[in-house]
Amino acid sequence: AQLVEGSTAKDYQKTETRLNIPRLDYSNGTCPSLLVEPQRTNILKYSEDFENIYWYEEPGNSVTSNTTISPSGIQNADTFTAVGGSEMNIHNVATFPLTTGTYTYSVYLKNNGTNLIEVYLYQIGPGFVAKGEINFSAETFTASIGTGTITNVGNGWYRVTLTNSVTAGDFTTGVYTTSTTGTRSVFVWGAQLEAGSYSTSYIPTTSASVTRNADQVAKTGISSLIGQTEGVWYLDLYATGKNKDGAGYATWLIAGDSSNNFQIYNIGTTLYWYAKNTGGVLIDQTANQTLVEGERYKIAFAYKAGDYALYINGVQKRTSTNANVPAVSQFNLSAEGYGASPVIVKNEYNAVALWTTRLTNTQLAQLTTI
């Protein structure tokens, strides 16, 4: 027996204990990245079934199910259509409560003859609290309330997102256009509303909200695999993640505990390298590298008593002659904090490796060249 999220069966995975399968993201090409994300809940129900009574079509509007191939590769995307003098407006049939906080609404859209389509988050009383418009021909998404993003996911589909902070109240989400001329139509799939200041990967729902657990990449008790006097930590990743508050990309690597550790982390768009042992902080410096969201970075953190170096994309960024080396026996990827339950942040890793000897500077440059 097997239970999976969504309305479609997946290939059977034999298990004797809990599955421990990494999630892979192919959006950056044919070679996948390891996707690491925090726990999130899709608050919206029937996220792919807009004909369900959970959704409401205003007079003059209609929804036709399963009319075209969605980003999932299955023919399960719906068509929204408005005719006559009616505005297109399809939204939740009933409001739902949200507590005070920051939320992100996302939905997948594909052009079906109407170039300008708007999406929104609406609060009873104040009105629109997040609102934006996609221009299919220009491949842009402009937020008039809140902040927005657009991602081309292929085959004419775009994922648009809206983010804003709200006060507690009752809300609804929707897709609409103010045009009342002719027939207006758009393909729609995969609606999601989640608490947080950025969107995470799509979580399908049916009759109830669904929570996806955090992806934790960690290992303890491996002092024999980590160089205790010298070595190299290596990361190859895309700067696509955010920290728990959304302000930047947060910790990319943390090896060790609160007394002895190596870290690669950021504050905003500034990257840092850090080392500490029981005697105190050894290194805490900027990496002379401004981060650009969506860019790829290859990073090598080399350490040895009196011979530290940091290389990024083939260039030596920092050195240190500190004579001390942290003794570590564990590591976490994309986590803020130590121990078994750190706060997970979002990142996409192409490769992670470590060496128990310090590579030469020439080797570090070659290793990190893109």
Question: What residue spans do the PLM features occupy?
Answer:
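Extracellular, beta-strand-rich glycan-interacting domains
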Residues: A1-A9, D49-F50, L109, R184-S199, ...
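Extended recognition patches within non-cytosolic domains
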Residues: L3-S33, E194-L225, K317, N350-I370
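GGW-centered surface loops in extracellular recognition modules
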Residues: G6, L19-E48, G169-S197
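Extracellular glycan-recognition surfaces and repeat-rich motifs
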Residues: P22-P32, I53-T79
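Parallel beta-helix/beta-solenoid repeats that form elongated, surface-exposed shafts/blades used
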Residues: S33, N260-Y265, V281-D284, P342
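Extracellular glycan-recognition modules
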Residues: R40-S47, I53-G60, S86, P97-G101, ...
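Extracellular glycan-interaction surfaces
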Residues: T67-F96, Y103-S179, V186, G190-L193, ...
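Flexible glycan-contacting loops in extracellular carbohydrate-active proteins
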Residues: D170-T180, S185, S320-E348
